[in-house]
């Protein structure tokens, strides 16, 4: 469980043993985002007043990105070179924006005047003044459908310059993203998925499809990549019945057979305590596989999963899936004929905590510090848990 101020990474979390998959993703993203320097168009001067916290939800013009500038850097480190504002580390900006300020030090006014005389574009005033200045710059990122100004959670991005390469970190919102995207860069592009490790060629201005909350890197001028395989064909396989097993001591039956997948909270015959199970349960089933076309890859798609799935096929570990899409390449593991699929699924502590809150304190198996701040309300409904599916197998071939 977590609270308003974060999530505790401790060994008592249900998902603790799966953390290497998540932290590996964090490590890869941080590694790539630390390379190079920011490549944004606008420097936003925060002003000279004390406590000048920027408005992170300010309706900044869509298609541009901003870095913040304080008085120390303005005075001691910022210079103008070839019409661009630069710092010793190598980052540069095209516009220095100074919003309407009620208070400004004489030294600040003097320094801004010096930078303007050196050829830098210094813009005073509100958003309208900034927009007029940016018309001569051109958008760094354009999308179809177009996004509104301000912090837009449908499609967010960061731009960094790594040597001769332009690297964009793109993040979709909770609804996902499917639309055309144009970056202000020429040349061949490659999309890199830090979760799966997949890397494929992409053409600037084409449609970019992202699952809910998915993030990818789009790189121009870096390593070349092969074209993505888009020909997707479902392979006829019957994934049923399922044998579902739970550990002892938490109110759930040790074994149950399911003809169809459903949330643990909706399994007929389960007690209230069983429906509220939190932890890891194991799914097992067998299916017959007839093969796919030569050269095609096989991808197993578990559909909806709540919340983490560790996949085994024919006794071999395939991969841990902790975010959408809950799918993995099983080309090296699947075989013609009978196959044995095992999936270990882990949910969060939430359902058990909700159940325990409605029990006498002596009967509870979970407890939380700072109960007032962290506990869900007594009447909170249980959230879905387990594999909800549908589970499918696909053959992925070249176009």
Predicted feature locations:
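Carbohydrate-binding surfaces of carbohydrate-active enzymes
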Residues: 1-280, 288-292, 330, 392-395, ...
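Short, hydrophobic/aromatic-enriched beta-strand segments in well-ordered soluble domains
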Residues: 216-222, 285, 341-347
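Glycine/proline-rich low-complexity spacer/linker segments in large multi-domain proteins
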Residues: 223-244, 347-393
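Beta-strand/loop-rich accessory regions of lumenal/periplasmic or secreted enzymes
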Residues: 263-269, 273, 304, 321, ...
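Aromatic-lined ligand-binding clefts that engage carbohydrates, nucleic acids, or primary amines
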Residues: 287-314, 341-345
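Short, surface-exposed tryptophan/glycine-enriched loops
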Residues: 288, 328-340, 344-349, 354, ...
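A beta-strand/beta-hairpin structural motif
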Residues: 322-326
